[in-house]
Amino acid sequence: MAPQMSQKEADIAMMLAAGCHLGTKNVDFQMERYVWKRRADGIHIINLGKTWDKLMLAARVIVAVENPQDVIAQAARPYGQRAVLKFAQYTGAKALAGRHTPGTYTNQKDAVFAEPRVLVVTDPRTDAQPISETAFVNIPTIAFCDTDSPLKNVDIAIPANNKAKQSIGCLYYLLARMVLQMRGTISPANPWDVMVDLFFYRDPEELEAKEQEEEETAAAAAAPAADAGYNAVADAAYGAESWDDQAGAGFGAQAGNWSEAPAPTGWDAQQGGDFGQGFGAMPPQGY
């Protein structure tokens, strides 16, 4: 019997399956310490052991904030928007998905002004504006950093693949679970009843195509059941025989009269006949 994996080993196996270890061909000089090796094709492999340690550190920082609403998770990248919304749903934090409004953390007259205690971003490149703003107001920043990500103004860098939708969803899932475990909301001994698939990005076009395919399959399955008592062959034969009998009889009756002169009908039959008979029967008068 194989020994049971520890929580860290199970999490690393999940991150491997999600592709969190795959970096890029470029490496920032500050990210070299998190790179394990370089593949033959030039892709750098991230050390997931250090990724797990940084996830634990980030979870401790988030748990230290008394009010969960003072934590903001932000993602401008489309693949990370669903993940930050799910992270905020389960941890009680706020989520900002989509384009960042300049001045959100620095302009107090802005309608969307916010003063978080901790900021969590998905990519230091696409989320460069909120990182630069939080640096002005001394807000700690946690960021998922790839091998080519700049670490300027980033306080806690979590080395991982921040470009794939499975990787981003897995990272936010693990971070949310660690936060809930440290708060005592869920027990570390029991598995979390939330699936990691809920944090993955879903393409609206793929969902629409899938729903349409399911509807077509259901309609095709219901069609034979509705027509089970209908015999198309017998109905076609009956219709053909009835049409032949009726059309043939009428056609034959009309065909036999083709050699005869057509009988007058309408005004000619009534007026013409009476006029001929009356003219022949009247005797000449006045001659």
From Swiss-Prot:
GO molecular function, one term: structural constituent of ribosome
Domain of life: Eukaryota
Keyword Mitochondrion carried by entry: no
InterPro entries on file: Ribosomal_uS2, Ribosomal_uS2_C, Ribosomal_uS2_CS, Ribosomal_uS2_euk, Ribosomal_uS2_euk/arc, Ribosomal_uS2_flav_dom_sf
Keywords: Cytoplasm, Ribonucleoprotein, Ribosomal protein
Region (Disordered): 249-287
GO biological process, any: ribosomal small subunit assembly
Annotated localization: Cytoplasm
One matching Pfam family: 40S_SA_C
GO cellular component: cytosolic small ribosomal subunit
Family statement: Belongs to the universal ribosomal protein uS2 family.
HAMAP family named among the record's database cross-references: Ribosomal_S2_euk (MF_03015)
Assembly: Component of the small ribosomal subunit. Mature ribosomes consist of a small (40S) and a large (60S) subunit. The 40S subunit contains about 33 different proteins and 1 molecule of RNA (18S). The 60S subunit contains about 49 different proteins and 3 molecules of RNA (25S, 5.8S and 5S). Interacts with ribosomal protein S21.
Function per UniProt: Required for the assembly and/or stability of the 40S ribosomal subunit. Required for the processing of the 20S rRNA-precursor to mature 18S rRNA in a late step of the maturation of 40S ribosomal subunits.
The protein, known as: Small ribosomal subunit protein uS2
Organism: Ostreococcus tauri
